UniProtKB/Swiss-Prot annotation:
This is Short transient receptor potential channel 6. Changing residue 897 to K: In FSGS2; increases calcium ion transport. GO terms for molecular function: actin binding; actinin binding; ATPase binding; calcium channel activity; clathrin binding; inositol 1,4,5 trisphosphate binding; monoatomic cation channel activity; protein homodimerization activity. Pfam families: Ank_2, Ion_trans, TRP_2. PANTHER family: SHORT TRANSIENT RECEPTOR POTENTIAL CHANNEL 6, TRANSIENT RECEPTOR POTENTIAL CHANNEL.
Length: 931
C-alpha cells in the first residue's frame, strides 16, 4: 500500500521553517491520540483497530519508531502536567491505552475518535475515569463539547449523568443541558426533584462527582443551581420539566424530618435552608415560577428579614437575599411603560381595581411594601407619581399651583372648617362632599383641627402669662360661699373645648383600632404616642373632676348653712377644713396637683405630635426622620447608660450614706441625692466638693474622689461621645439617602388619608352623619342575613347528617365507599364551621394561581422585559477567561473535524490513485493479449 505524500515521513530540512514545525507538532499530537501499538510502559502490544483519520502504516518501520517516540514524549508531558495524580486516585487503578485515548478524545473534542471507539470497540468502558475521578461525559461537558455529549448519552448504563447536568448548569451551557435532560433518566421527572443527598442514601452515583461525593452541595438540585447561577433559559427548561424548589419548613418546625436533620448535622441543615432560599430569592426563579412575582417577592423578602434576626450566624446572607427580592420588585416597577402597568404592580389586580364606591385604587401591594419597608419600591418615581395623582384627587389643578396659593387654601379650610363639616353632614355626595373626601383635603382639615387644638392649649394658659393673682398661701375669701380653692372651680369654656377635642381624638383612635386591629395599631409608634397622650389627658381631666367634686361637696355644706358668715369663728369638719387650706399645705397626692402634673405632660406630648405631619414638607421631612432615628439611638444607649449609672449611684450611696449631716452638702447621702448629683454631673452642673467630708476620713474621701472621677471619665468622655458618634452616624445614613427616606415617610403619611372614612376632623366626628348611619344600617342588615343563612345552613347540614345516620342504621349505607363518603361529609361540616389554616392558605394560593386575565397579561409583558434586560446586561459584560476558554475548545473541536475531513479526502484520493494505477497496469496487459 503506497503512502500518501501528505502523510509520508519528512526527510531532510525544508526551507518552509515555521510551517513545517507547526505541521510536525500537530502531527505528533494527532498520532498521540491514535496510537494503538504501545502499551502503558511504551512497549508494543497486539495490534488494535485503528480509529480516526490516519491510515495504518504497519509496513513502515520509520513511521512506527517515530510514533513510539512521540507517544513516550507526549505521555511524559501529560504525566508531568498531571503529577499529583496519586493524591486523587487509587495507585492500583490504571487506565489502558484505549481508555486514555478515549478520555483524551472526549476532553479535547475529538469527535471522530469518540464516535468510532463507541461504535467499534465493544469492550470499551465508557465510565472509566481519569486521575481526578472524571469520566468522559464529565470531561466533555466541562469543555462544552455538545456533539461528544450527545454521543455519550446514547450509551446505556452511563453513570454520573446528574453531575454532568449540574456542571452544565453551573457553566451556563444551555444546549448541553437540553441534551442531558433528554436522557431517559429524566423521562419521569423524579430525578429533577431528587437531591444528591437523597441519591447517596439510595446508593446511587447519579449526582456523584467521584467516589467521594458530589461536586456541589448535597442539597443542591438542578433547579436550585440554575437559580443560583441566574440562568433564565435553564430555569425555564427545568420548570417545564416539572422541577420546583421546595420551600423550607419554618425555622421552629418540630416535625420528624426537621428534627432528624437538625440532630444529624445542624450545619448542613442550615446550609440547605440557605441554598433553598437562595434559589427562591433568585430573580430567575421569581420571574419564571410565580404568576404573581410581586407578591411572592414581597412576602419572601419579609420572611428572609425575619430569618436574619433569628439566625444571627447567617444574618448577612439572609439580609442580602432579602435585599435581592426587594431589588427584583424595584426592577419590575422600573420597566413599566404606562399607568396601567404601574397600577397592576401596585394593586395586584386591574380588573377589580377600584375599591369601594368611590373608585379609588386599593394599592394592596403598596401597602405590603410599606409594611415590609421596601423603601426603594415606595420611593420609586413611578410609584410616587401614582400616589401623587391620588393625593390630589378631585383637586388636580391645585398640584401645579404655587406655595402661596396652597397656603391660602389651607387657611381658607381652617377658617371655614365648621361650614365644610355642615355641608358634608347634609350633602356627602355633592361636589363639595367629594372634595372633602379627597386625601389632600382630609389632611388639611385634620391638620387645621389639630392646630386649633394646640391654640386652645396655649390660650388656656394665657391668663397666667403675667403671673397668678392669688398667692400660693392665700386662704381668705370674701364670702363663705366662695370656698373653692384657686383653680378648683368648674371647667371653663376653654377647657370644655379642649375636652371635646380629646374625646373626638379618642373616638377616632377607637375607630382606627377597630379598622386596623390591635396588632397593627400597636405596631405603629405614632399610635402609641397618641394613645399615651390621650390617656394622660383623660387621667388629668378625671383627677381634675375629682378635685372639683370634692370641692363642690365642701361648698354644699357651706351652702346648707346660711348662718355661717365668718369661717374663722367656726369649727369646720376635715372634709371642709382641708379644702380651705393654702396650696403650700395641700397633700402631695391631691387630685388637683396630680391633674396639673399630668396636664403638663400631655401638653408636651401634644406639641411633639406636630412631627407626624412634617414629612409632608421636603425641607422638614428629612429632619424629622433624623430626629426619630436619634431617639432610637438614645434608647439603645440608655441600656449601657443605666447600667453604669446605677452601679456608681449605689456605690457612692454606700460610701456616703453614713455621713448625713457630716458633709458640705447632702450629695450621695441618700439614693435620691445620689441620683440628682450623678445625673447633673453629666452636664457639668455638680460640684467637686460633693465628695468632701467634714471629718478627717481621708480614705473614704479619696475613694470618693476616685469613683467620682472615674464616673465623669466614663460617662462624659466615653459614653456621651459614643452617643454623639452614634447620632452622627444615623444622621449621615439618612443624609446619604435622604430622598428615598423622605419619600418613604411621606408615602406612609399619605396612606393614612387614602383609606375611606375619617373625613370629618376632630371634634366634628363626634356627631354621626346621615351617611354613617346609612352604612351602619347596611352592615347590620348584612350581618343579620349572614347570621340567618348560617343557622339555616347549619340546620340543613344537621338534617342531612341525621338522615345519613338513620340510613346507616337501617343498612342502606353499609359499603366501604358509603362509609368513606360519610367521613368526608363530616370533615366538610367541620371545615364549614371552622376553616383550618391550611384551607385558607390553599384559597390564598388558588387566588394567585388563577389571577385575572388582564393582570396575567401585564405581568407576562413585564417579566419578558425583565428577562430580556437581564440577558442584555449579561451579554454586555466583558469577555472573561471562561469565554476565551470556550472559544479555544470550539477551535480545538473544529481542528479535529477538519483533520478528519482531510484524512478522509486523503484516503479517497489514495483509493482513486490505486484504482487508476490498476487500470493503467491492466491496459498494457490487454494490449499484449490483443497482440
Amino acid at each position: 500500500m503506497s503512502q500518501s505524500p501528505a502523510f509520508g515521513p519528512r526527510r531532510g530540512s525544508s526551507p518552509r521553517g515555521a510551517a513545517g514545525a507547526a505541521a510536525r507538532r500537530n502531527e505528533s499530537q494527532d498520532y498521540l491520540l491514535m496510537d494503538s501499538e504501545l502499551g502503558e510502559d511504551g512497549c508494543p502490544q497486539a495490534p488494535l483497530p485503528c480509529y480516526g483519520y490516519y491510515p495504518c502504516f504497519r509496513g513502515s518501520d520509520n513511521r512506527l519508531a517515530h510514533r513510539r517516540q512521540t507517544v513516550l514524549r507526549e505521555k511524559g508531558r501529560r504525566l508531568a502536567n498531571r503529577g499529583p495524580a496519586y493524591m486523587f486516585s487509587d495507585r492500583s487503578t490504571s487506565l489502558s491505552i484505549e481508555e486514555e485515548r478515549f478520555l483524551d478524545a472526549a476532553e479535547y473534542g475529538n469527535i471522530p475518535v469518540v464516535r468510532k471507539m463507541l461504535e467499534e470497540c465493544h469492550s470499551l468502558n465508557v465510565n472509566c475515569v481519569d486521575y481526578m475521578g472524571q469520566n468522559a461525559l464529565q470531561l466533555a461537558v466541562a469543555n462544552e463539547h455538545l456533539e461528544i455529549t450527545e454521543l455519550l448519552l446514547k450509551k446505556e448504563n452511563l453513570s454520573r449523568v446528574g453531575d454532568a447536568l449540574l456542571l452544565a448548569i453551573s457553566k451556563g451551557y444551555v444546549r448541553i443541558v437540553e441534551a442531558i435532560l433528554s436522557h431517559p433518566a429524566f423521562a419521569e421527572g423524579k430525578r429533577l426533584a431528587t437531591s444528591p443527598s437523597q441519591s447517596e442514601l439510595q446508593q446511587d452515583d447519579f449526582y456523584a462527582y467521584d467516589e467521594d461525593g458530589t461536586r456541589f452541595s448535597h442539597d443542591v438540585t438542578p433547579i436550585i443551581l440554575a437559580a443560583h447561577c441566574q440562568e433564565y433559559e435553564i430555569v425555564h427548561t427545568l420548570l417545564r420539566k416539572g422541577a420546583r424548589i421546595e420551600r423550607p419548613h419554618d425555622y421552629f418546625c418540630k416535625c420528624n424530618d426537621c428534627n432528624q436533620k437538625q440532630k444529624h448535622d445542624s450545619f448542613s441543615h442550615s446550609r440547605s435552608r440557605i441554598n433553598a432560599y437562595k434559589g427562591l430569592a433568585s430573580p430567575a426563579y421569581l420571574s419564571l415560577s410565580s404568576e404573581d412575582p410581586v407578591m411572592t417577592a414581597l412576602e419572601l423578602s419579609n420572611e428572609l428579614a425575619v430569618l436574619a434576626n433569628i439566625e444571627k450566624e447567617f444574618k448577612n446572607d439572609y439580609k442580602k437575599l432579602s435585599m435581592q427580592c426587594k431589588d427584583f420588585v424595584v426592577g419590575l416597577l422600573d420597566l413599566c411603560r404606562n399607568t396601567e402597568e404601574v397600577e397592576a404592580i401596585l394593586n395586584g389586580d386591574v380588573e377589580t381595581l377600584q375599591s369601594g364606591d368611590h373608585g379609588r385604587p386599593n394599592l394592596s401591594r403598596l401597602k405590603l411594601a410599606i409594611k415590609y419597608e421596601v423603601k426603594k419600591f415606595v420611593a420609586h418615581p413611578n410609584c410616587q407619581q401614582q400616589l401623587l395623582s391620588i393625593w390630589y384627587e378631585n383637586l388636580s389643578g391645585l398640584r401645579q399651583q404655587t406655595m402661596a396659593v396652597k397656603f391660602l387654601v389651607v387657611l381658607a379650610v381652617a377658617i371655614g372648617l365648621p361650614f365644610l363639616a355642615l355641608i358634608y353632614w347634609f350633602a356627602p355626595c355633592s361636589k363639595m362632599g367629594k372634595i372633602m373626601r379627597g386625601p389632600f383635603m382630609k389632611f388639611v382639615a385634620h391638620a387645621a383641627s389639630f392646630t386649633i387644638f394646640l391654640g386652645l392649649l396655649v390660650m388656656n394658659a394665657a391668663d397666667r402669662f403675667e403671673g397668678t393673682k392669688l398667692l400660693p398661701n392665700e386662704t381668705s375669701t370674701d364670702n363663705a360661699k366662695q370656698l373653692f380653692r384657686m383653680k378648683t372651680s368648674c371647667f371653663s369654656w376653654m377647657e370644655m373645648l379642649i375636652i371635646s377635642w380629646v374625646i373626638g381624638m379618642i373616638w377616632a383612635e377607637c375607630k382606627e383600632i377597630w379598622t386596623q386591629g390591635p396588632k397593627e395599631y400597636l405596631f405603629e409608634l405614632w399610635n402609641m404616642l397618641d394613645f399615651g397622650m390621650l390617656a394622660i389627658f383623660a387621667a388629668s381631666f378625671i383627677a381634675r373632676f375629682m378635685a372639683f367634686w370634692h370641692a363642690s361637696k365642701a361648698q354644699s355644706i357651706i351652702d346648707a348653712n346660711d348662718t355661717l358668715k365668718d369661717l374663722t369663728k367656726v369649727t369646720l369638719g376635715d372634709n371642709v377644713k382641708y379644702y380651705n387650706l393654702a396650696r403650700i399645705k395641700w397633700d402631695p397626692s391631691d387630685p388637683q396637683i396630680i391633674s396639673e402634673g399630668l396636664y403638663a405632660i400631655a401638653v408636651v406630648l401634644s406639641f411633639s405630635r406636630i412631627a407626624y405631619i412634617l414629612p409632608a414638607n421636603e425641607s422638614f421631612g428629612p429632619l424629622q426622620i433624623s430626629l426619630g432615628r436619634t431617639v432610637k439611638d438614645i434608647f439603645k444607649f440608655m441600656v449601657i447608660f443605666i447600667m453604669v449609672f446605677v452601679a456608681f449611684m449605689i456605690g457612692m450611696f454606700n460610701l456616703y450614706s453614713y455621713y448625713i449631716g457630716a458633709k458640705q452638702n447632702e450629695a450621695f447621702t441618700t439614693v435620691e441625692e445620689s441620683f440628682k448629683t450623678l445625673f447633673w454631673a453629666i452636664f457639668g452642673l455638680s460640684e467637686v466638693k460633693s465628695v468632701v467630708i467634714n471629718y478627717n476620713h481621708k480614705f473614704i474621701e479619696n475613694i470618693g474622689y476616685v469613683l467620682y472621677g472615674v464616673y465623669n471619665v466614663t460617662m462624659v468622655i466615653v459614653l456621651l461621645n459614643m452617643l454623639i458618634a452614634m447620632i452622627n452616624s444615623s444622621f449621615q445614613e439618612i443624609e446619604d439617602d435622604a430622598d428615598v427616606e423622605w419619600k418613604f415617610a411621606r408615602a406612609k403619611l399619605w396612606f393614612s388619608y387614602f383609606e375611606e372614612g375619617r373625613t370629618l376632623p376632630v371634634p366634628f366626628n363626634l356627631v354621626p352623619s346621615p351617611k354613617s348611619l346609612f352604612y351602619l344600617l347596611l352592615k347590620l342588615k348584612k350581618w343579620i342575613s349572614e347570621l340567618f343563612q348560617g343557622h339555616k345552613k347549619g340546620f340543613q347540614e344537621d338534617a342531612e347528617m341525621n338522615k345519613i345516620n338513620e340510613e346507616k342504621k337501617l343498612g342502606i349505607l353499609g359499603s366501604h365507599e358509603d362509609l368513606s363518603k360519610l367521613s368526608l361529609d363530616k370533615k366538610q361540616v367541620g371545615h364549614n364551621k371552622q376553616p383550618s389554616i391550611r384551607s385558607s392558605e390553599d384559597f390564598h394560593l388558588n387566588s394567585f394561581n388563577n389571577p385575572p386575565r388582564q393582570y396575567q397579561k401585564i405581568m407576562k409583558r413585564l417579566i419578558k422585559r425583565y428577562v430580556l434586560q437581564a440577558q442584555i446586561d449579561k451579554e454586555s459584560d466583558e469577555v472573561n477567561e471562561g469565554e476565551l476558554k470556550e472559544i479555544k475548545q470550539d477551535i480545538s473541536s473544529l481542528r479535529y473535524e477538519l483533520l478528519e475531513e482531510k484524512s478522509q479526502n486523503t484516503e479517497d484520493l489514495a483509493e482513486l490513485i490505486r484504482e487508476l494505477g490498476e487500470k493503467l497496469s491492466m491496459e498494457p496487459n490487454q494490449e499484449e493479449t490483443n497482440r
